[in-house]
């Protein structure tokens, strides 16, 4: 029995016009016209699909920044309202959970749910954490860092999500 072995460079996503795995972060996002064209979707393998014209902000991928003065998480949650989001800090982790019940859209009914967990640096001041949702659906979780040697205040608590009326100033990478 012959088994085809693919080189690792073949499996990497080298750009928006190269194939990506079926079960990547875009799974369940809906279909585009090019997803239905058989010559594009099965050119390489039936388990690969083209992810054309997708941007980082449309993908739900988060961005974590940690510099000398602060720690910031940017997360695209454009399909959720502040009431659908729960943000809480437990020990050294921040947990962001989003869920909305089934609702109707242009193509039928849809429900969404996600759960993200991030480790907080040990020097983040947990008493001064904040979380806001911009008008364009970008969730920003941030907290200042304290100088080393001071207590960062570790405990479990919920962080309220405030709504901003202006779009996010997060970079699009």
Curated annotation (Swiss-Prot):
Binding site for Zn(2+) 1: 100, 102
Residues bearing PTM Deamidated glutamine: 6, 50, 90
Keyword Lyase: no
Post-translational modification: Acetylation at Lys-70 may increase chaperone activity.
Subcellular localization: Cytoplasm; Nucleus
Record-level GO cellular component terms: cytoplasm; nucleus
Residues in coiled coil: none
Modified residues (Phosphoserine): 45, 122
Glycosylated residue positions: 162
Listed Pfam families: Crystallin (PF00525), HSP20 (PF00011)
Modified residues (Deamidated asparagine): 101, 123
Domain of life: Eukaryota
Positions of region (Disordered): 144-173
UniProt-annotated binding residues for Zn(2+) 2: 107
Modified residues (N-acetylmethionine): 1
Positions contributing to Zn(2+) 3 binding: 154
Keywords noted in UniProt: Acetylation, Chaperone, Cytoplasm, Eye lens protein, Glycoprotein, Metal-binding, Methylation, Nucleus, Phosphoprotein, Zinc
GO biological-process terms attached to the record: lens development in camera-type eye; negative regulation of apoptotic process; protein refolding; response to heat
Family: Belongs to the small heat shock protein (HSP20) family.
Its biological purpose: Contributes to the transparency and refractive index of the lens. Acts as a chaperone, preventing aggregation of various proteins under a wide range of stress conditions. Required for the correct formation of lens intermediate filaments as part of a complex composed of BFSP1, BFSP2 and CRYAA.
Assembly and interaction partners: Heteromer composed of three CRYAA and one CRYAB subunits. Inter-subunit bridging via zinc ions enhances stability, which is crucial as there is no protein turn over in the lens. Can also form homodimers and homotetramers (dimers of dimers) which serve as the building blocks of homooligomers. Within homooligomers, the zinc-binding motif is created from residues of 3 different molecules. His-100 and Glu-102 from one molecule are ligands of the zinc ion, and His-107 and His-154 residues from additional molecules complete the site with tetrahedral coordination geometry.
Record's protein name: Alpha-crystallin A chain
Source organism of the structure: Tapirus indicus (Asiatic tapir)
Highest classification ranks of the organism: Eukaryota, Metazoa, Chordata, Craniata, Vertebrata
Gene: CRYAA
């Amino acid at each position: 029995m012959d088994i085809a072995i693919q080189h690792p460079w073949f499996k990497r996503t080298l750009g928006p016009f190269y194939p990506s795995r079926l079960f990547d972060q875009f799974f369940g996002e809906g279909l585009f016209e090019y997803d239905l064209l058989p010559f594009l979707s099965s050119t390489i393998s039936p388990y690969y699909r083209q992810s054309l014209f997708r941007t980082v902000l449309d993908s739900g991928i988060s961005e974590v920044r940690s510099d000398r003065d602060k720690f910031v998480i940017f997360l695209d949650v454009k399909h959720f309202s502040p009431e659908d989001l729960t943000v809480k800090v437990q020990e050294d982790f921040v947990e962001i959970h989003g869920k909305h019940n089934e609702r109707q859209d242009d193509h039928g009914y849809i429900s969404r749910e996600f759960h993200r967990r991030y480790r907080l640096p040990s020097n983040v001041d947990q008493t001064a954490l904040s979380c806001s949702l911009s008008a364009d659906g970008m969730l920003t979780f941030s907290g200042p860092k304290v100088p080393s040697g001071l207590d960062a205040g570790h405990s479990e608590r919920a962080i309220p999500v405030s709504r901003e009326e202006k779009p996010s100033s997060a970079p699009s990478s």
